[in-house]
């Protein structure tokens, strides 16, 4: 698993799934951050250059990689690279959905830039945490059934 560590609210849940299934997990960010002392967990600190964490993640995506990110452009890159991508709210991004999600994200950014939309995403809640855990468990189970 690869985690885009910037503002990831489900790290604790990821670590539990990592231990349950014995999955090597990389937590990637452009600055130092604390991590639990776990053999399966590896901290990756990249340069502070724009998108360097995203670039590292995409370079290390494999067919059976699960990437957790709330960054829609990164999710699109992961899907194109053949990885499985989940948001912290449990949304699965795949080839059939990522184009629409990316277009909607770009539209909302444009509207916000023009001052036409002032809303922001709703706060992260317990329901999101539960949906994420279910989606992550399902993704791991699917990959295991496929022989990974």
Swiss-Prot record:
Domain of life the protein comes from: Bacteria
Entries under HAMAP family matching the protein: UPF0178 (MF_00489)
Family named by the database record: Belongs to the UPF0178 family.
Record-given protein name: UPF0178 protein BH16190
Lineage, opening ranks: Bacteria, Pseudomonadati, Pseudomonadota, Alphaproteobacteria, Hyphomicrobiales
């Amino acid at each position: 698993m690869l985690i885009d560590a910037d503002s990831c609210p489900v790290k604790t849940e990821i670590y539990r799934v990592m231990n349950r299934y014995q999955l090597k997990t990389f937590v990637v960010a452009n600055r130092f951050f604390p991590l639990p002392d776990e053999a399966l967990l590896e901290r990756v600190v990249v340069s502070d250059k724009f998108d360097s964490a995203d670039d590292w993640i995409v370079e290390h995506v494999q067919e059976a990689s699960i990437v957790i990110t709330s960054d829609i452009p990164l999710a699109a890159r992961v899907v194109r690279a053949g990885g499985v991508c989940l948001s912290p709210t449990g949304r699965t991004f795949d080839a059939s959905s990522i184009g629409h999600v990316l277009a909607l994200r770009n539209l909302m950014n444009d509207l916000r830039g023009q001052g036409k939309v002032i809303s922001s995403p709703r706060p992260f809640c317990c329901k999101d945490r539960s949906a994420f855990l279910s989606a992550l468990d399902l993704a791991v189970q699917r990959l295991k059934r496929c022989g990974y």
